[in-house]
Amino acid sequence: MTAQVQVLISRPPGEPQSLDGFARTVAYRLAAVPGLKVTLVPHLYDLAPDGPAMQYLRGLQTDLVVLAALYPRAAFWVLDACGVRGRLGRTPSLAEEETLEALTGPHRQGPTPQRTLWCFDLRAYFDPELLVQEVLVAIGRGGLPVAAEKGISGSQTGPAAEAAWHEIAEATSSRWYPVIDFQQCNDCLECLNFCLFGVYGVDKADRPKVEHPEACRPGCPACARICPAGAIMFPQHGDPAIAGDPHAARQALRLDLSQVLRGLGPAELAALERARALNADPPAAPPAEPQPPQPPPSDSLSGASAQLVDLDTLVDDVDKLDL
């Protein structure tokens, strides 16, 4: 009997509820392969850690294929931070030594289940059939036909198409927070010392953790630039080295930016980004609870004047004491 593999298709950010033609074809083709179960969720980076999608994923015991508009390492560590853990599987975009490092890194937090997570970047593919074939090769089922065995074609809509996958509905909004690659992290706590917004904390082993992700200022990647190990990612950032591209040299943060940005080094640039974020509006707070109307003061005095009268009365009372 063929072991079941869960296929997770994460909607790209801002995508409407209906799948585009590319993702639709991929979903149909993979759902037609025996032993593959396809699940559709909103954009992976925007999912709440305690939301229904992450709760569902944490309950899975099977191997997992992740198709998301994120670099594979970023997707892997986003899931890891939410308790969806496993071994990083080799794909065409990840070298074998990189996957081995992620499995055996000394700074990996918590136990690692004996299952594999294969992560694919949807943005790297233009041919859905190529992506389907690479998924099948990665999970050891290369050469299997991917015809629509269930009578579903890539252009079909309606009840039969809807039955091809399982969809988890979850209301999301655009998020911005750091993701730590614990294979690269050396526990220097530079991120904790540098960030002014209370994003970071430490666990029981004094290792850094993203404690308050919602406190991070949107658009600020300063801690990623200051990290000496290049362990901090912002998956939505425009710079591939910060967003988690496995092929982007970590030294690019130190070399290219120094040349492009008028000689600014990473520390100076990070300080400028932090200062700009500090002066920006803080993340939106939840609406305050409505307060009942306060009764008007009993006399014409209020505010500071009333406080002065109370103070004068207190002084007079003290003067009358027989001390």
Language-model features: where?
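Intrinsically disordered, low-complexity linkers and terminal tails enriched in Pro/Gly
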Residues: 95-106, 146-170, 244-249, 284-299
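Short glycine-/small-residue-rich Rossmann-like dinucleotide-binding loops
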Residues: 69-70, 196, 228
